[in-house]
A protein has these predicted regions:
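Membrane-embedded alpha-helical bundles that constitute the cytochrome b-like, heme-associated redox core
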Residues: 1-240
Length: 240
């Protein structure tokens, strides 16, 4: 017999679907290029905000949104592979996937902040590095995306596998926030599924993520104007 519990809070679910949509849109705008490259940059900043929010929410959000509940420690991975793991949220392999995706996205967004396309686009932090380093980071930005794409495909394959083989729908709970689990499992694990969720914590997370986006998108430069590395190089006296 099963019961329905609330497992994923609304901020977590909104983050998940907004991230999926924005990464998809970012990929499309990058491939099309041209006038859409500016939108690619805006989407990158939006994804940065989502990532910062998720990191903060991973510490102060509700129970199953917190990293401590699903971080793939060695003991958890061993228990899962031996069939002894009991839990409601992300299983250890799922937790490993989440950490890998977040880390890869962080590198992808971080390199994009300094990137350029040698035509008209420059990342918001382009002026803080010299052109050669920006070119190097641009190369990493392009390379890391291939790894990110592989992780996304693996994520989708896992969803299909769970639906087809294990008869477990992972999509519906991420839409509704609710999940059906055996009563015995509900009694064996923590039941405080919404612990920590509250408007003040949500507001704090939004303030932190918004502040970071504001800072890297020009806020820091407005408060503390700096001369770009390119301008410094041009102003340096020539040696004969």
């Amino acid at each position: 017999m099963k019961i329905t519990i609330h497992i994923w809070d609304l901020p977590h679910r909104l983050f998940h679907w907004l991230l999926a949509a924005s990464v998809t849109a970012s990929y499309i705008t990058a491939k099309i290029g041209g006038a859409l490259i500016d939108w690619h940059g805006r989407l990158g900043l939006f994804i940065l905000g989502l990532l910062v929010f998720r990191i903060v929410w991973g510490f102060i959000g509700s129970t199953h949104s917190r990293f401590v509940t699903f971080f793939p420690t060695f003991s958890r991975l061993v228990a899962y592979l031996k069939g002894r793991w009991q839990g409601i949220g992300h299983n250890p392999l799922g937790g490993l996937s989440v950490i890998a995706l977040l880390a890869t996205l962080a590198v992808q967004v971080g390199t994009g902040l300094f990137a350029n396309d040698d035509i008209a686009f420059e990342g918001p932090l382009f002026d803080f590095v010299d052109k050669s380093f920006s070119d190097q980071l641009t190369g990493w930005h392009n390379t890391v995306f291939d790894f990110l794409l592989a992780l996304v495909v693996l994520h989708l394959v896992a969803i299909i596998f769970y639906r087809g083989v294990k008869k477990t729908n992972l999509v519906v709970p991420m839409l509704t926030g609710k999940k059906k689990i055996p009563i015995a499992l509900a009694e064996a694990v923590a039941t405080d599924h919404d612990k920590g969720f509250g408007p003040l914590r949500l507001i704090l997370s939004l303030i932190i993520s918004s502040t970071v986006v504001w800072g890297v998108s020009g806020g820091i430069s407005q408060l503390y104007p700096v001369q770009s590395q390119q301008q410094i190089a041009q102003a340096a006296p020539s040696s004969f």
